[in-house]
């Protein structure tokens, strides 16, 4: 069996070496010749997998180590009898940690009280749903917009217009869809961007084209009161450098790049592949993860809750280093910048998720206990 896989997928050998030959290739340069003799294709979101790539090949299983499937032609898969799997929720916690770290940076820059702001979460799936749970657990005022879920299930949802009108912070977590009533392509176009409340913080860690990047650049130039945090970009790995310069935080599509998130994605497609073969999985991710580097955090009961929240969030993720690294890469020719974008992702330093953090409170503090619980850290 020949397995062709994106070279940046972690733990390939640990999970897949028992099935056959593994051939690692750069994800952006996958072509028909590369996959023609493959039985299995394992990719990330940088590879578009469609008829043009697969027709005439031996591929019968496609796995993507990502939440989203907008890079997969699922209609063609069905027509061709190709089984497939994504990794829903694999990096959701990492993205939540990214948003929490970004909020701490924004609050520090603006001297804002995070408790006094109204938060809007657009998209309440694996990522957005977890973020909503954390924000509400912290006692913050949260509005949620997700029209497809509002139709399909009961829930306390609001319209996008209400999000724009009422929220001081808007965090985007929608999939990318380009057609139909639920299209999210340029969901935040010039008109909606111009309608943002004064002082709004806009965070996009979903897909780049959910926000019209050219329009956002012009709106940010015209309105210094707005703050933008972008982890995803239209046309990436090519980035609008002028837009990045206007963002308070800019990063190269790494929001979900926690160690657990990346390895969990591989584990999920391994499990799906085992099911495809009709055999039980024999390898567990828990046996492969190293212990957290930060063993424990001790907080005295008298600790200021706001300081404790900031410290716990930043103990697992502080976006300022990624922002600085990314800005240093935005020099030279466009081709050099494209290569640097991919290199930053390929060689991204490992970071851990907050759910692996153990926190001990010395004494009794309901406020601190609530924060630890809301964040999903382990109280000991």
UniProtKB/Swiss-Prot annotation:
Keywords, sorted A to Z:
Cytoplasm, NAD, Oxidoreductase, Pyridoxine biosynthesis
**Keyword Coiled coil among UniProt keywords:** no
The organism is Pseudomonas fluorescens (strain SBW25)
Q: What is the catalytic activity of this protein?
A: 4-phospho-D-erythronate + NAD(+) = (R)-3-hydroxy-2-oxo-4-phosphooxybutanoate + NADH + H(+)
List, alphabetically, the Pfam families matched: 2-Hacid_dh, 2-Hacid_dh_C, DUF3410
Top-rank lineage group of the source organism? Bacteria
Please name the catalytic residues of this protein: 207, 236, 253 (proton donor)
Q: Could you tell me the EC number(s) of this protein?
A: 1.1.1.290
Q: For NAD(+), which residues are the binding ones?
A: 146, 174, 205-207, 231, 256
Task: State what protein this is by name.
Answer: Erythronate-4-phosphate dehydrogenase
Q: Which InterPro entries match?
A: D-isomer_2_OHA_DH_cat_dom, D-isomer_DH_CS, D-isomer_DH_NAD-bd, Erythronate-4-P_DHase, Erythronate-4-P_DHase_dimer, NAD(P)-bd_dom_sf, PdxB_dimer_sf
Outline what the protein does: Catalyzes the oxidation of erythronate-4-phosphate to 3-hydroxy-2-oxo-4-phosphonooxybutanoate.
Protein localization: Cytoplasm
């Amino acid at each position: 069996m020949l397995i062709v896989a994106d070279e940046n997928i972690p733990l390939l050998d640990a999970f897949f070496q028992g099935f056959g030959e593994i051939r690692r290739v750069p994800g952006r340069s996958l072509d028909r010749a590369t996959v023609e003799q493959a039985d299995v294709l394992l990719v990330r979101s940088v590879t578009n997998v469609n008829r043009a790539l697969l027709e005439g090949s031996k591929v019968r299983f496609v796995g993507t180590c990502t939440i989203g499937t907008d890079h997969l032609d699922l209609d063609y898969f069905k027509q061709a009898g190709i089984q497939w799997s994504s990794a829903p929720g694999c990096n959701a916690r990492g993205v939540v940690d990214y948003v929490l770290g970004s909020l701490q940076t924004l609050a520090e820059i603006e001297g804002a009280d995070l408790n006094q702001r109204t938060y809007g979460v657009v998209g309440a799936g694996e990522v957005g749903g977890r973020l909503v749970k954390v924000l509400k657990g912290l006692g913050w005022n949260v509005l949620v917009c997700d029209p497809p879920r509002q139709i399909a299930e009961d829930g306390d949802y609001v319209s996008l217009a209400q999000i724009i009108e009422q929220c001081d912070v808007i965090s985007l977590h929608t999939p990318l869809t380009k057609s139909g009533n639920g299209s999210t392509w340029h969901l935040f176009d010039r008109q909606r961007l111009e309608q943002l409340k004064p002082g709004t913080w806009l965070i996009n860690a979903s897909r780049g084209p959910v926000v019209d990047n050219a329009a956002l650049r012009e709106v940010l130039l015209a309105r210094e009161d707005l703050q933008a945090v972008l982890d995803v970009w239209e046309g990436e790995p090519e980035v609008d450098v002028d837009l990045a310069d206007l963002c308070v935080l800019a990063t190269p599509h790494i929001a979900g790049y926690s160690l657990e998130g990346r390895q969990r994605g591989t584990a999920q497609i391994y499990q799906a592949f085992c099911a495809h073969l009709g055999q039980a999985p024999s390898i567990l991710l828990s046996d492969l993860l190293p212990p957290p580097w930060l063993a424990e955090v001790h907080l005295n009961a008298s600790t200021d809750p706001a300081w404790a929240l900031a410290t716990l969030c930043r103990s697992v993720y502080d976006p300022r280093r990624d922002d600085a690294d990314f800005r240093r890469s935005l020099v030279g020719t466009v081709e050099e910048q494209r290569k640097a974008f991919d290199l930053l992702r390929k060689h991204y330093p490992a970071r851990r998720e907050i759910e692996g953090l153990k926190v001990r409170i010395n004494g009794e503090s309901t406020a601190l206990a609530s924060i630890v619980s809301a964040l999903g850290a382990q109280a000991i």
